[in-house]
Amino acid sequence: MTPPPPKRQKRDEYRKATAEATSQSGASDVAEIKLPKKKYYRQRAHANPFSDHHLKYPLSPAHMDWSSHYPAFVNPDPSHINLAGARRLLKDVEVVDIGCGFGGLLIGLAPLLPESLIVGMEIRVSVLEYVTTRIQALRAQQQKLRAATATATAASETPSQQQAQIDGKQANANAAADAASPAPSTDTEHMPTTLVPGSYENISAIRSNTMKFFPNFFARHQLSKIFICFPDPHFKARKHKARIISETLNAEYAYALRPGGLLYTITDVEEYHHWILRHFGVELGAEEESEEKSTSPNANANAGVRELFERVSEEELEKDECVRVMKEATEEGKKVARNKGNKYVAVFRRKTDPEWPA
């Protein structure tokens, strides 16, 4: 009797079978296209951002090849290429999810922002492979459903009415699915019954170390939204330097954000929430308060951050659908809701660059 295969072999076999099933776009049964299961893509919760990972990154934003990530948005004119010789896109990437994890926010934002290109940045290999496979499966599902809908529409006597009915159901069905779908269903979800705006062609994920190479991917004022959802809190004081929110990184985020752009943050750790507010100049720490009282020369240490960002009011956040998706669609957000924990949200708007003094 042969022993059962080891876990690593089972994971590799499952991943290979899933990739083959997704790539076979000519299959007749759309129900065969299933989303990947997380249990075959397990990895440690942390990755050291200071290690020298084997990462590929462009020399500059003008050298980045986005054509393989967004094939539906590639410029049809082959003469339009970037400095690396890759095909250009019809539009630039303008929404970034830093530390995208298993891609819950990407999936939730895709139908909400169908005209915007969204990218997730993740440093862990297995997690990125899961997200990539998940996006490919969702695209294949939408492609099959779109073909089936087109066939049914052609055979119908009133195609315009049928298409209008389908288009009218898209937004409501997708919003209801995002709000009501439980976390376990994301691993076993089968073929959807309605088309999704954008067909998930506007989302992708890349492996990158944001703390080191963020400016290599995005040009000045390129982005309209940046999401940092449930980042690693790094509780130990000696690990605080690895936090994704810092004065140095905030300056890089401000460089890539266009004036009026938004930076979204959410965490379930209250101490980290106050850390975020302090590093965006909204709150003062104990040392800064004492320096401010003593009129020390270092009292304006966060003056630069205050000139670049302002906090968005709670009234505006209640009207922002991206905040709802950030709370409900992410895997960490669902876990916090199951555990009845608190979610601390802070959104900051990029100010207009101050004018040079005359």
Curated annotation (Swiss-Prot):
> What family does this chain come from, according to its entry?
Belongs to the class I-like SAM-binding methyltransferase superfamily. TrmB family.
Binding-site residues, S-adenosyl-L-methionine: 99, 122-123, 209-210, 229, 330-332
State its Enzyme Commission number(s).
2.1.1.33
Q: Which gene encodes it?
A: trm8
User: What is the name listed in the Swiss-Prot or TrEMBL entry for this protein?
Assistant: tRNA (guanine-N(7)-)-methyltransferase
- Top-level taxon: Eukaryota
- Can you supply a Gene Ontology BP term from the record? tRNA methylation
Catalytic residues at: 232
List GO molecular-function terms, semicolon-separated.
Answer: tRNA (guanine(46)-N7)-methyltransferase activity; tRNA binding
Organism annotation: Aspergillus fumigatus (strain ATCC MYA-4609 / CBS 101355 / FGSC A1100 / Af293) (Neosartorya fumigata)
Q: Where is this region: Disordered?
A: 1-29, 151-194
